[in-house]
Amino acid sequence: RQDLRAAEDALWRWMTAAALVRARGDGGVVMVVAESTIPTVQSLIRWDPVGHAEAELAARAEVGLPPSVHMAAIDGAAEAVSALLDEVRLPDGADVLGPVDLPPGVRRPAGTPPDVPVTRMLVRVPREHGLTLASALRRGVGVLSARQNTEPVRVQVDPLHIG
């Protein structure tokens, strides 16, 4: 599946299932029917979740994906998302990405009319600016809420699914 955590979830499930098998001395066997060169399969064969996590982190750092960076997802009507981004002073080094579709299974922001298309913008910052990003977005949401003239927006810092 297309998800940043797909390999992590697969390894966790496989290791959980393998842990239920009786000991090798008692005749227990775990079989993996998959291409042995796949890194996740290698991690299972070596029983190395730490090595797998280190490799995943390095790969994500190379392309600027969490958890090597902090990321905020801003969901809502295009005008409301734009209004929030216009209001916020983003930290140095911030990248605004999108719009992207909402990930499958993610609900629309509460209060968004069903006929209004929902968009998602992503804001990516270096790890050291995560608190600054969260504070700026909190302030921006507060300002827009006080104005009461925009559609609702949902802000998630470091969401599990980014789009």
Name each region found by the language model.
Residues 1-9, 16-163:
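Accessory helical-bundle/CTD segments and flexible terminal tails appended to RecA-like ATPase motors
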